Amino acid sequence: MSCHNCSRTALGLFIRSLTNIQPAFAACRPLIHPQSLRFLSDARRPRRVDQSASRPDGVKPDTEIEDELSGEGFPRKRERPAWAIQKEALKEKLGGEAWNPRKKLSPDTMEGIRHLNSTQPDKFTTPVLAEHFKVSPEAIRRILKSNWKPSDKEYEERMERWNKRGERIWSNLVEMGVKPPKRWRDMGVGRARNGDVPRWKSRERNLVDVKDSASSDFTEYIPDEDIIPTVGKESKSKPTTSSIPLSERL
């Protein structure tokens, strides 16, 4: 029995050697799995596929994408930034016109607008007031409709700011030889020190052209208080009295 098994094993080994089959002891060897390389070469490095070459001509990447199942094209949704949405809404609101920010009027100016319209409504109409104060007619209509009045504390603070502003402006005009009104002289504006003559009494007086902020349409309007003047932009000095001949002065 053992001789038969030995002859059969020897015959099997002989046949395997002729047919280039793996040796009989190959199954007993440990299997060694090849390890992956730590660093990839240029040949094995993954490359990014360029989709522009496979895209058909005339199709933009962000416009339409064709559905493979239905065969219909649908637009790709892209979120727009907030500033772009606001810009488009503002453009539609303005009707294509340029952006012109609103001019902020002081409470005293708005009160003066209401006073002008109430005293002479035929002369100081809404278009005239809008043209003079450089605001829209709709803003003038809202000012005329409003009945807001400041409190006593707000009125006192506003008058204090107004007096400081007028004192600062008239102090600068005194240095240019302009005589301040009696109200500001009583407050000490233009008062000379150490017995000197005020500048508005010297030869260097009235060197600038001073006018109020009202135009020709407002010449007949008599304000309740003094108007703070503005200096003309022409930078032309007015002739002094000493340079005018006596015959012309008389």
Swiss-Prot record:
Q: Name the residue ranges with Polar residues bias.
A: 238-250
- Transit peptide located at which residues? 1-40
Look up the domain of life of the source.
Eukaryota
Which Pfam families did the record assign? Neugrin (PF06413)
Alphabetic keyword roster: Mitochondrion, Transit peptide
What the entry lists under InterPro entries is as follows: NGRN/Rrg9 (IPR010487)
Q: What is its main location?
A: mitochondrion
Q: Which GO terms describe its cellular component?
A: mitochondrion; nucleus
Query: Segment Disordered: which positions?
Result: 43-80, 225-250
Subcellular localization(s) per the UniProt record: Mitochondrion
Signal peptide per UniProt: none
Q: Which family does it belong to?
A: Belongs to the RRG9 family.
The function of this protein is: Required for respiratory activity and maintenance and expression of the mitochondrial genome.
Q: What is this protein called?
A: Required for respiratory growth protein 9, mitochondrial
Name of the gene: rrg9
